[in-house]
Regions:
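Hydrophobic "anchor" residues
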Residues: 43-44
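A short, well-structured catalytic beta-strand-centered motif of the EAL phosphodiesterase domain
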Residues: 47-48, 150
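C-terminal accessory region of radical SAM enzymes
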Residues: 2-24, 49-96
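Residues immediately within or flanking Cys/His clusters that coordinate Zn2+
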Residues: 26, 85, 90, 136, ...
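Short, ordered coil/turn segments that flank beta-strands lining enzyme active or ligand-binding pockets
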Residues: 39-40
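Short, small/polar residue-rich loop motifs at catalytic or cofactor-binding pockets
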Residues: 29-32
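Conserved alpha-helical substructure of the radical SAM core
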Residues: 56, 95-165
Length: 165
């Protein structure tokens, strides 16, 4: 039997919590259309694994273009375009949790979007993209955030290979 990961435990705890699950209809998140995150194992995601635990592929084994427009990547983008956000953990994603305030700039009401490129994506229901705007390389396990979705304090590498390099 496989031991559940910390991520599995957190997602189960959150699922059973009183954190509100907001309706995402009428909102658009640009993250899957503009952002990639690559961890030390080469796994690629569009955002934090605690917010969406779905990999698009692995750049160690797959061509970048294939990861960028993998079936999973396109399905995630489709779920944003149809308003379901079905791949997102609506209880851990701080962008979705910002809905009562009208979004956070990355997640916006569709009628508030001014970026023409994003408006074209929405209008044409584009799930394939030609390029990415931001790439975040997650080369070490340190984090300067005290994010309630995954930790209550900072994680700092103070010894070992990650610290020395």
């Amino acid at each position: 039997m496989n031991k559940p990961s910390n991520l599995d435990n957190i997602n189960e705890d959150v699922t059973n919590s009183d954190i509100p699950d907001f309706d995402t209809a009428g909102f658009f998140c640009s993250q899957p259309f503009t952002n990639l995150e690559v961890n030390t194992r080469g796994e690629v995601r569009t955002c934090c694994a605690y917010w969406m635990n779905q990999t698009l592929g692995n750049i160690t084994f797959d061509e970048t273009e294939n990861v960028l427009n993998s079936d999973t990547a396109q399905d995630i983008r489709k779920s944003i375009l149809d308003g379901s956000f079905s791949y997102c953990n609506k209880k851990t994603c701080p962008r979705i949790q910002s809905i009562p305030k009208g979004g956070d700039g990355i997640l916006q009401r569709i009628e508030d979007i001014e970026d023409q490129h994003l408006l074209d994506i929405i209008k044409n229901k584009e799930t394939k993209i030609d390029s990415i705007k931001y790439v975040n390389f997650l080369w070490d396990l340190s984090c300067n955030l005290r994010c309630p979705s995954c930790r209550v304090s900072t994680i700092l590498n103070t010894k070992g290979e990650a610290y020395e390099n």
